[in-house]
Amino acid sequence: MTKQTEYKRKPEWLKIKLNTNENYTGLKKMMRSKNLHTVCEEAKCPNIHECWAVRKTATFMILGAVCTRACRFCAVKTGLPTELDLQEPERVADSVVQMGLKHVVITAVARDDLKDGGAAVFAETVRAVRRKNPFTSIEVLPSDMGGVEENLKMLMDAKPDILNHNIETVRRLSDRVRARAKYERSLEFLRRAKEMQPDIPTKSSIMVGLGETREDLIEAMDDLRANNVDILTLGQYLQPSKKHLPVLKYYPPAEFAELKEIALSKGFSHCEAGPLVRSSYHADEQVRSAKEKTAEAK
């Protein structure tokens, strides 16, 4: 049996028990009523039922639901985006109140059609959530916003509790996996964020199963640490449709455990690694862990 045939079917550890209790259905109705989007739905996250039904958490996706890029791993719609909705920040903030969230993740589609990459609306969303939810920690997950330093500064000046920007894959595969984004530009984005606000933890995520080697992954970890990234998440890539890149390998849980140990040995303050781990998975626990370790270091 060839390796390709061996990984044709999803293994047992990727089978998910669906839970659509009243929390799940209630959150879904609320999102629709407020004309809000979540990356949980748009990117077909495998953890949506756990997060919505059990943990009652969600990751808001602002700046519309249409992305200007067409990364070959991503299920989010691509094309010409809609006009900016300047009332969106307040609706997100109101939803955080209604959901009673202790930690919220705010992400966005890439808006290469905008000079600021959507930074102004992103920053205002952070401020709106902070005004109405002063005890809620806020994590932001932006695109590289064109690599423009002023755009990043606008966002960092809003003082999120954590800055997350994903390199998504290893250096060797980056151009094939996300042609409109650049590996080095993402590293620079993360480095600049830390330079602008040294006390704000930074975070990044890598998908596995796209053809990377163990050496590729170790190189990516070293690159992130060299740019002072604090938190790393590692998860299994799952093909959203036949139009997207195929899965070349399904990593077993034991291999994720090995990768986590390697990451922690590199100096990451926290590493979340597992088949169903996504960038926002258990994000509240990640930011708490990072802050505790930062306090200990002082």
Curated annotation (Swiss-Prot):
Q: Give the EC number.
A: 2.8.1.8
Q: Which Pfam families match?
A: LIAS_N, Radical_SAM
Q: What is its main location?
A: cytoplasm
Protein transport found in the keyword field: no
Any idea which positions bind [4Fe-4S] cluster 2? 67, 71, 74
In what pathway does it function?
Answer: Protein modification; protein lipoylation via endogenous pathway; protein N(6)-(lipoyl)lysine from octanoyl-[acyl-carrier-protein]
| Compartments reported by the entry | Cytoplasm
- A Gene Ontology molecular-function term? lipoate synthase activity
First-tier enzyme category under EC:
transferase
Question: Which residues does the annotation say bind [4Fe-4S] cluster 1?
Answer: 40, 45, 51, 280
Q: Which reaction is catalysed here?
A: [[Fe-S] cluster scaffold protein carrying a second [4Fe-4S](2+) cluster] + N(6)-octanoyl-L-lysyl-[protein] + 2 oxidized [2Fe-2S]-[ferredoxin] + 2 S-adenosyl-L-methionine + 4 H(+) = [[Fe-S] cluster scaffold protein] + N(6)-[(R)-dihydrolipoyl]-L-lysyl-[protein] + 4 Fe(3+) + 2 hydrogen sulfide + 2 5'-deoxyadenosine + 2 L-methionine + 2 reduced [2Fe-2S]-[ferredoxin]
**Cofactor: record remark:** Binds 2 [4Fe-4S] clusters per subunit. One cluster is coordinated with 3 cysteines and an exchangeable S-adenosyl-L-methionine.
Give the record's keywords alphabetically: 4Fe-4S, Cytoplasm, Iron, Iron-sulfur, Metal-binding, S-adenosyl-L-methionine, Transferase
Q: CDD domains recorded for this chain?
A: Radical_SAM
In its UniProt entry, what is this protein called? Lipoyl synthase
The lineage is: Bacteria, Bacillati, Bacillota, Bacilli, Bacillales
